Amino acid sequence: MLVNIKQMLQHAKQHHYAVPHININNYEWAKAVLTAAQQAKSPIIVSTSEGALKYISGHQVVVPMVKGLVDALKITVPVALHLDHGSYEGCKAALQAGFSSIMFDGSHLPFQENFTKSKELIELAKQTNASVELEVGTLGGEEDGIVGQGELANIEECKQIATLKPDALAAGIGNIHGLYPDNWKGLNYELIEAIAKATNLPLVLHGGSGIPEADVKKAIGLGISKLNINTECQLAFAKAIREYVEAKKDLDTHNKGYDPRKLLKSPTQAIVDCCLEKMQLCGSTNKA
């Protein structure tokens, strides 16, 4: 059974930890993320972007796949299925398909349009008891072909969005998607604290991959209740595949090293290990 993110994020906010949000890209990813969550006894937000959703062949594959894995793996921790950086139409489609949570990314729109569409989606989400994450201030970096320059969120706009009572708020706080450059200025802690106090909402740290652990922990202490991870899992997966091939294990015909079940075993475990590390960092271990 899938749950929304409202209760898990409120608990995280009250007890000063963060719930990990891990983007999935295929079956192995979904299985690895759920396996790690069960091992760590951590609540988990299984997420997919619209690009990954298309790659996996759509809602009709992703929703039953995640639900089926929850049952087959006997997952007992809270699991939310979340749409990451959804468009207005994408959010509506995800809600109709059975996603338990959505993030509407209207940050690139004029603020009033973002506000109006956010309000409409919150009302729509209530019909299926789904949760809604909203965004103010574009995030830097690239996400599924959408490039953001990155900007610091406006406090007044955050306050206005908060009147809609979303379940979580993603705000531009100096974070970016993908790998952080050497000249990255870092997170704006004063802004995190100010937004947390002004909105009283669980805050979301997008682009959580590559931020120094001490910085993440400080941000969690100031009000971050959801940590988004994608790039680090991708890097771990790619590294394990490269090591397997460089060791020429795929050429071992005697042991059928070319079998995809063998080739993908260590990369899938690499995702599990990465997720376990992030759950420790979030402080979500043993919180389910």
UniProtKB/Swiss-Prot annotation:
A family per Pfam: F_bP_aldolase
Ligand binding (D-glyceraldehyde 3-phosphate): 49
GO MF term list: fructose-bisphosphate aldolase activity; zinc ion binding
Keyword Cell membrane: no
Pathway linked to the protein: Carbohydrate degradation; glycolysis; D-glyceraldehyde 3-phosphate and glycerone phosphate from D-glucose: step 4/4
Bound cofactor: record note: Binds 2 Zn(2+) ions per subunit. One is catalytic and the other provides a structural contribution.
SUPFAM superfamilies named in the record: Aldolase (SSF51569)
Catalytic reaction equation(s): beta-D-fructose 1,6-bisphosphate = D-glyceraldehyde 3-phosphate + dihydroxyacetone phosphate
PROSITE patterns: ALDOLASE_CLASS_II_2
Residues in the signal sequence: none
PANTHER family recorded: FRUCTOSE-BISPHOSPHATE ALDOLASE, FRUCTOSE-BISPHOSPHATE ALDOLASE CLASS 2
Family: Belongs to the class II fructose-bisphosphate aldolase family.
Protein's UniProt name: Fructose-bisphosphate aldolase
Organism, as annotated: Mycoplasma pneumoniae (strain ATCC 29342 / M129 / Subtype 1) (Mycoplasmoides pneumoniae)
